[in-house]
Amino acid sequence: MMQICDTYNQKHSLFNAMNRFIGAVNNMDQTVMVPSLLRDVPLSEPDLDNEVSVEVGGSGSCLEERTTPAPSPGSANGSFFAPSRDMYSHYVLLKSIRNDIEWGVLHQPSSPPAGSEEGTWKPKDILVGLSHLESTDAGEEDLEQQFHYHLRGLHTVLSKLTRKANILTNRYKQEIGFSNWGH
């Protein structure tokens, strides 16, 4: 029984989640030959109503998958992949995240285009969301709790991003009329 749990944990390790995401984005990048065709094409799929996320047990136990309802419009959970974004925006964002994972995050202040202040991510936003994990007394920090919280978050985000990359790849194939490529 221990062997099954170990294999299951390895299958759902952070490294494997990152590799699945990077592989999905590489596949998307190789499939999308003309990215400009993605402009003004909405990325909508009927099966996106339920997102799949991965839970890490608080005691380090095996992971379990669960389905959660999709975030409501305007909620913080759906901000990166807002319905108003087109396939090209998703394509650029997914490639950017892949590059950040592979090469590290460059700390360059980026100047947003004029009039695009709404809906942009700011570094302080993550600090607001994590403020409940910070303790007033440094000795009271629960590093294990923080680790599991962030690990759960990484697994959830990587699962959703991988799914988005796969959906974008399939939608591109449909848009150009090659829905049976690679099958």
Curated annotation (Swiss-Prot):
It comes from Rattus norvegicus. This is Mid1-interacting protein 1. It is found in: Nucleus; Cytoplasm; Cytoplasm, Cytoskeleton. The keyword Lipid metabolism applies. The modification Phosphoserine is found at S72, S75, S79. GO terms for biological process: lipid metabolic process; negative regulation of microtubule depolymerization; positive regulation of fatty acid biosynthetic process; positive regulation of ligase activity; protein polymerization; regulation of lipid biosynthetic process. Belongs to the SPOT14 family. GO terms for molecular function: identical protein binding. One of its GO terms (cellular component) is cytoplasm. InterPro entries: Lipogen_MT_Stabilize_sf, Spot_14. Homodimer in the absence of THRSP. Heterodimer with THRSP. The homodimer interacts with ACACA and ACACB. Promotes polymerization of Acetyl-CoA carboxylase to form complexes that contain MID1IP1 and ACACA and/or ACACB. Interaction with THRSP interferes with ACACA binding. PANTHER family: MID1-INTERACTING PROTEIN 1 (PTHR14315:SF16), SPOT14 FAMILY MEMBER (PTHR14315). Plays a role in the regulation of lipogenesis in liver. Up-regulates ACACA enzyme activity. Required for efficient lipid biosynthesis, including triacylglycerol, diacylglycerol and phospholipid. Involved in stabilization of microtubules. Residues 51-77 are annotated as: Disordered.
